[in-house]
């Protein structure tokens, strides 16, 4: 968790190993923003329920864990079409109390439910009143002038 690893810093950017940064775009976005969190919009889904469906159909995780998590977020009242981000780039003001809570709860959810971290993260943003649609930028796969995204290996969960 970045607030534990980097307490001396105010903010951090997590970037998946399969992404190369090709420009100053991301850094300029961060400099110009007052948000405590930002991530790219998901390349395909804008609804967490559609992503659950896709993850189940592609068998990307344990079916029981996915269904248990899906039931949990439904019971909590997670709305449809709230927005959905991709966790391949995460900007966080990681010492912010709300972000600390999200990160700690995220660890608990990934430890106890599906390992597909985008699912639980989107729920936790909603639960902690971070508007996904206001906190996302164009997907990195679509910004070929700013990012190069390598494909994941087939059969990887």
Tell what function each PLM region has:
Residues 1-157:
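Glycosyltransferase catalytic domains, chiefly GT-A lineage
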């Amino acid at each position: 968790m970045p607030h534990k690893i980097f307490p001396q810093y105010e903010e951090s950017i997590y970037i998946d190993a399969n992404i190369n940064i090709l420009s100053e775009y991301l850094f300029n976005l961060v400099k110009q923003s007052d948000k405590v969190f930002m991530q790219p919009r998901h390349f395909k889904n804008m609804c967490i329920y559609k992503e659950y469906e896709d993850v189940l159909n592609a068998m990307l995780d344990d079916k029981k864990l996915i269904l248990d998590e899906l039931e949990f977020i439904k019971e909590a009242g997670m709305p449809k079409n709230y927005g959905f981000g991709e966790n391949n780039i995460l900007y966080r003001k990681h010492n912010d109390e709300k972000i600390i809570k999200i990160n700690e709860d995220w660890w608990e959810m990934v430890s106890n439910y599906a390992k597909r971290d985008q699912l639980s993260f989107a729920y936790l943003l909603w639960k902690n009143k971070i508007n996904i649609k206001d906190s996302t930028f164009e997907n990195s796969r679509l910004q070929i002038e700013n990012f190069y995204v390598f494909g994941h290996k087939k059969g990887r969960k």
